[in-house]
Amino acid sequence: MKKYLLIIAALLGSMVMTAQNMESVKITHGPWLCDMTENAVTVVWKTDVPATGWVEFTENHGQHFYSEEHERVYDARFGRRLTHETIHSVRLTGLKPGTNYMYRIFSQALTGWGTSDDARLGEIASSVVYKKEPYGFRTFSNDTDELKFFILNDVHGRSDDIRRLCADVDFSQYDFVLLNGDMLTTTENEEQIFSGWLDACVDMFAKNVPIVYVRGNHENRGQYADNMYKYFPSHNGQFYYTFDAAGISFLALDCGEDKPDSDIEYHGILESDKYREQEAAWLENEIGNLRYDKRIAILHIPAGNSTWHGDIHLHNLITTLLNEAGVSLMFSGHTHQYAVRKAGELADFPVLINGNRTYASVTVKGKKIHVEVIGETKEENHSLDFQFR
């Protein structure tokens, strides 16, 4: 009898512990900023259990965050606040251009569900604003002709390399950080995303400086690859999009895979050719909607740089459109080797290919584009100047 009582007590204790665990929630990763414009930005973070998510924010005039009450902006879709997610993304809209904001993130654990909409909610986790400064950001402005941004690509999961290479970088001087593809070799699970590169980015800059996210060919690989959009949603629902900053129209493009879709490496699940054709149709239409004559393209694979299928297909579909758009410069990666292709070699504009162990610091002032490519040795460092057409 005593034995059975002990078993029952253990089971009850386990049930109590489970209930307690369901009541609590922790923010385990993030936040990070993405998809910024002059009047909007998306805040994303991760919790350990399903929860609601919301952001409170305000203009930063040097006041304490809680000098006044702030509106809650929830992670919501189609009129319902999401409760079953562990990745939370909140789009802040109606912002002022070129304005400093501060923000705080919150999540409340989902502990159970009754009938209909009887969601039971537990404890709240949040970022700290009492003992340290709240997170902050500055929206893009098109009333200036100055811009500074930072480029990393082809990290392939080497988060330690990010930390080492960027250890002395003052990210507060940058308007955004461009991640130009192949941040992992293959995406098999969520933990790889965080441990391979995203945690390093959050620790170094992404809470306060927005990420411009562009996929490489390797972002198409792995059983978890189809989930990447949850971590980097965009305002048009695609991995290709445009945005404006400092009177420049940026065309952020998606390259697809580098080999034919029928290659045995893809096991019959790729449709990169059809996808690129859809992207080209979008681009042809989008060119007429660009707001500014200064134009920069971003594409992981430097179209036409090799005789691989992806390069050729991109070149045939995209390059002519970019020429017609009057692009002045394109930033690429993929080859793992720094190179500059002059105007007339691959396109009517120059193409700067950043290596896999260097970063590029880009400063725009008026019609001038100055680029510093920095590596761990002097031999890897380069200084270049370009001009808008």
Which residue ranges define each predicted feature?
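Bacterial Sec-dependent N-terminal signal peptides
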Residues: M1-M22
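Acidic, histidine-bearing metal-coordination/catalytic regions of metal-dependent phosphoesterases
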Residues: T18-I151, S172-Q173, H370-R389
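Extended active-site neighborhood of metal-dependent phosphoesterases/phosphodiesterases
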Residues: F106-G136, Q192-E284, L317-N323, A339-V373
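Conserved, compact domain cores that house catalytic/ligand-binding motifs in diverse enzymes
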Residues: D145-Q223
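Alpha/beta-hydrolase fold active-site loops
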Residues: E146-L147, D175, Y240, G247-I248, ...
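Active-site neighborhood of phospho(di)ester-bond hydrolases with catalytic His/Asp-centered motifs
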Residues: F150-N153, F176-D182, P210-N217, I296-H300, ...
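Active-site environment of divalent metal-dependent phosphoester hydrolases
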Residues: G157-I162, T185-E188, R215-Y224, D258-S262, ...
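Active-site-proximal segments of metal-dependent phosphoesterases and phosphodiesterases across multiple
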Residues: Y266-H267, S272, G288-M330
